[in-house]
Amino acid sequence: MSKKAVVFSADLSYMEKLETAMKSLCAHQDQLKIYVLNEDLPTEWFAIMNQRLRQLDSEVINCRMSPKQFQSFSLPSDHIHYATYFRYAIPEMVEEERILYLDCDMIFTQDLSPLYEVDLNGYGLGAVVDKPTTIDGFNAGLLVIDKTWWQEHQVTEALFDLTREHHQQVYGDQGILNLYFKDAWYSLPWTYNLQVGSDKDQYLYGDLDWYDAFQGIPAVVHYTSHNKPWTSKRFNRFRELWWFYYALSWEEILLRKPILKQTYQDLVGEFLYHAAIYTNTADIHELETLLKELPDVAIHVLAHSHFGFNLVQLERYPNLFLYPSFDPLTSRKVLEKLDVYLDINPYDEVDQITQTIQQLDLPIFSFEGTNHVENGETQVFADDQVQEMVAAIRDYLKRNEKKHGNK
């Protein structure tokens, strides 16, 4: 059986992201011929990858590109490298007739073999609609390419001509590709390119339906925009999925161990209990003490803004999880696993959260100087009684282990 052609385009700064994407791809299929368009990846890396991929009847090809003809083209954003234009040369670099181009900021959760069999209805390109940006253009992060069609229509030459003329007016190579193909491309199912990089922006735009528009786990998760999962900020869905494949060893992939069916939590371990704080200030009363004294309690801190450094520096405690500019989906996921709520942020309450906690019938622990509960039960301690609060939380969690299904 012939190998299936896959193409990535990367530079040295993205080598780690490229390898993570390759891990997720190889975890679900073999017999791949992976072409990497690049100008600076070390030859040693290719040698190591080929040694590993050989066991999957796969290989990786070092396709060196000259930057001269690409460096003068405009880039739509500072997180995009001119290597994105390398894909123009795919028909010249790849031998196979059906080609699958993939961005490096993607994770693949299933076998992509069906894309090699899909009927493009006579078109030279298959892609996914660029949701939520447009309803008629496509996102260029995943492309199914008919090499013969591209060669017959001299697509590469046409793309270079269009780029020289329009590169300052359109969104990089994606804009050029859309300009060339217009309506003459085949629309693939949304599952093959779900752009979760848009999560934060859609929330800020007030598009709360965006989170429920796609249900389940897509075949391809695309971390578009600046909001990448490898940054310190938690903005998007499926962030932990990227870290799962990042942490997965090649040995586990090559041996097809059962761990492939597990999750990020299975790799790093799950906390026994969960607490939350919704805040609009980084000055959270006695937070560091609680982090120290309750190491088996994950404390999730959510805010509608970014966090000050006095709070960020507390991330040295592994049980602290920060969610700046949180969205409704993030809030919902935190609340679903909550055991207790810590009403310890001074100043105004956020989103009337204590009312929500009361509706969930969860206990609230507070200090006299931070208490936001006017009516209802809450355990309130003097501002200097943090150890008493710690003892009360421990006692509650111990008494309610079975109730909350905790271990």
What are these regions (language model features)?
Residues 1-4, 8-10, 17-20, 147-272, ...:
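A glycosyltransferase accessory/donor-loop signature
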Residues 53-92:
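Active-site-proximal specificity loops/subdomain of glycosyltransferases
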Residues 99:
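Short aromatic/hydrophobic "clamp" motif used to bind/position activated sugar donors
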Residues 108-135:
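Conserved donor-nucleotide/metal-binding helix-loop-beta segment in metal-dependent transferases, i.e.
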Residues 268-313:
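Conserved catalytic-core segment of nucleotide-activated headgroup transferases in glycan assembly
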Residues 304-305, 320-334, 350:
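Conserved active-site histidine-acidic residue motif and adjacent donor-binding/catalytic loop
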Residues 336-349:
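Acidic donor-binding loop of glycosyltransferase active sites
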Residues 363-367:
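Short hydrophobic beta-strand element within catalytic cores of glycosyltransferases
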